[in-house]
Amino acid sequence: MTKVCPKTEEKRVVSEAVVEPISADVSFASNHFPTYKLGPDDQIVDEPDEDDKVPSVKDVVGKETGDLSDQHKKLSVRDLACKFDKNLAAASKLVDEAKLNDVTSLEGHVMLKKLRDALETMRGRMDGRNREAVEKAISMVEALAVKLTQNEGELIHDKFEVKKLASFLKKASDDAKKLVNQEKSFACAEIESARALVMKLGGAFEEQELCSKASRDQGPNVEKLVEEVQEARRIRRLHKPTMVIGMQHELRDLKSQIQEKSAYSVKLQREIAIIKKAEGSKSCPYVLDGAQSLGSCLRIRASSDSGIDISKCSIHWYRAASESSRREAISGANRSVYAPEPFDVGRVIQADIVSNGQKFTVTTDGPINTAAGLQSRVESLLRKSNSEFTVVISQMNGQDHASRSHVFTVGKARIKLSRGWITKAREIYSTSMQLCGVRGNANVPAKALFWQLRKGLTFLLTFESEQERNAAIVLARTYAYDCNVTLVGPDD
């Protein structure tokens, strides 16, 4: 062991005789104490060692970070990944060195502890100037312990920075590898796409060459065929115009003859039907009067020579596609008068009369025709969002109702009956709503309309004209159909 404060050879001999040797398991980094200076407040300041030029861990970390930020924009993705791998290895090495420094620091604390214990033992055995020297050595050992603690704090901070940098470099390395793999996959996809495009273009070029070659081979034949067709057309223009024109005139004459015969056939069929009906009516004591179109009334009356009271007969009306087809009963139509509605257009109207146990049937001469001007009237109303009609309430819930004029509004989503600001009834289109021409007793059946909002609430409305009534029915059914509702009469 080195001497603490030697003066003479005799004192050195006495010290060697008195001081006990230090344990042999303590190892020293050098054979002398490091040099220190006392700064303000008795703080120990290290004197720089000229031989020690190794940079600290903090300086190395700062330098590597600066180099990384400077070269980040200059490096490619692959070079950046390699650089991150190298820095990650360096950071791992620094972490290992920090672990070794922890072991060395622990050995330093053990060494200082044993040295201080030895000096304490020496101080108890010495006196005078030797005691002062030992106390000074103890204070130096304590200062060394404080300095070692400070160095350990700095080392812990550097270790934390190194770990932080290592995690950052590891993450950056993973991101760089991921980016490299992504760019590689993109490049492979582009290469495959370019390869497929090249193959497609090559196939198109080959096909074009084959087509051009085939066209060159077939060129003379095509030209020959074109010449033959042109020659044939020229010959046709020169020699056949009279025959073609004659055939066209013959076709026109044949068409006109067919149309005349068809019209004559229809006329004969109507005459035959009228004759048959007249023959059948000789045995039937009832006659059906009225025009067979919308806006009119079909009225059953007894023949002049029968003398039967029609009011005492049981009557029911039917509609059918033709006289021989299956009939459909018109619910509620049991009077001697019936006004056809738009639902009856194109159909034959029949009526069964039961009198004195005998059943008779009267039929219209043909299907019911639409009224003139009704289609254009409906088309003009469809351009509006709401259409208003002036009506009078004749009945409400089957009871006669004395009423003033009201406004019957047919909209795209609902029907409303109002007078001024007061709304009498309003309802949206639904399956419970019914709307049709009147079928029961009414003063003017051709102008009357039956409207059921819902069960328990019905109206019998009279319009200003037959056309307004039929237009309102067609318009309401069109809007209801757009709402997926079929708006018809009872049991239709």
Curated annotation (Swiss-Prot):
Main location: cytoplasm
Listed GO CC annotations: cytoplasm; cytoskeleton
GO molecular function: actin binding
Segments forming a coiled coil: 112-132
Keywords: Actin-binding, Coiled coil, Cytoplasm, Cytoskeleton
Covalent S-S links between cysteines: none
Compartment(s): Cytoplasm, Cytoskeleton
Highest taxon listed in the record's lineage: Eukaryota
Family named by the database record: Belongs to the SCAB family.
Name by which UniProt lists this protein: Stomatal closure-related actin-binding protein 2
